[in-house]
Amino acid sequence: MAVFIAGCAHAQNAAPAPAAPAVRPQGPPDPYEGRKKLLVVADVQTGFHHNSISHAMATIEQMGRESGFYVAFLRTDSQLITSEPIVGSGARYAGRQINARNLDYFDAIFFLGSGEGTLTDQQKADLLAFVHDDGKGFIGGHASTVAFYNWPEYGEMIGGFMDGEFPVQPMQLIVEDPDFPGARDFPTTFTDQYQFLKAPYDTGDVHTILRLDPARLTAEQLARRPDGDFPVVWARNYGRGRVYISTFGHLDDPWDQPAVRELYLEGIKWALGLTDADVTPDTQSQ
């Protein structure tokens, strides 16, 4: 009897068992399990709406479907740029997790937006962590250098902001890194709208793949950057992740050119981790 009472007292004084950790809601079943997923975002609510955006999104989706390297998910809003579960709204779905995917589902983002953007501070933190900490990919299209211009950390991630642009015209290019997949056979003259960059751009922070040939620029054009540094396509590592920026695609036509499509496809593959390339920053590779 004494032993029984002592045992009861011990049981009454024992510390409660720790609470089980909260279980994060699971997303819907994955119909593309085992395949790379690319989130294509063209949120231009606060910026210039390039007429080529619809064609660009369709081309990116088509390249993934035809090559089999990735599945593209097309959005014209930024809702999915979050690490939080996505819940619905309205009478039917309010407070319920819906089948929209958050960043956990994707392997890279292809960003075609422009302007100051609609991201909340938490979404901005989630986007940076998606690349820097999670080791995912970020591909920026033509207008990505004029997006989020009041967000310094974004400019640091992509390598710089656009300072201005030349009118659409044929210009001469130098293939700076012919070993980067898709770059070797790019034509040395190509018609598009070319940009020139400003801070935080620094050639020591990026690996240039294609650039304008400064020897073929007019004095007026060269005055935009007297150092003659006019990158057109570049790549860089950002933390554990990969960033690939191409400024091609102001109009529809470049998206139909095999050389541009090949360059974008190979950039996507690299950002997804399907291929490797040396992206040592320019000043360190000399």
For each predicted feature, which ranges?
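Solvent-exposed loop/turn segments at secondary-structure junctions
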Residues: 44-48, 78-82, 110, 114-118, ...
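Stable alpha-helical elements in mature extracytoplasmic
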Residues: 34, 52, 56-60, 102, ...
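Glycine-rich, highly charged phosphate/nucleotide-binding loops
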Residues: 20-21, 76-102
